[in-house]
Amino acid sequence: NPYCLPPTDFMSGNKPITKKIKEIEKIAKSGLIPVTYGDALWFGQNKTYILSGDKIMTHIAKILKPRLCIFALNEDGLYSDLKSKKLIYELQGERPSISENKMDVTGGMTRKVEEASKIAKMGMNVFFVNGNKPERIVKAVKNRTFEGTLFRGKKNV
């Protein structure tokens, strides 16, 4: 069962609230599936900012250090070529081909790649999979061959 968590539940300004992030782990261990999302948040003195779901993933990964992180996309993963949709199965320094969506104020695919790279540098594997094909998420979680892109976790790189 999904359990919706607005970012205001675990963010104060632009900083994560560690104690509240740790509660997300308790929610997950209880059998519920924590679901959060990016949003416009209050920053004080009549200022707001956009917090992307991708940035939230980095905050959660840094505090909870999960075994892996999965970004569910509307695509199969990252492509080396957008026209042929040639999938990059493991990102190893090559530059993926990314089309920019000017309507995406959260940073789009470029932000996803940046945040996934940060998480991988913390030592966790990160998977980009097509969220419209849930069996791919299951395969990634079970460490089976899956269709998508892997950012291999690297410690102290």
Range-by-range predicted roles:
Residues N1-V157:
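C-terminal catalytic "cap/lid" subdomain
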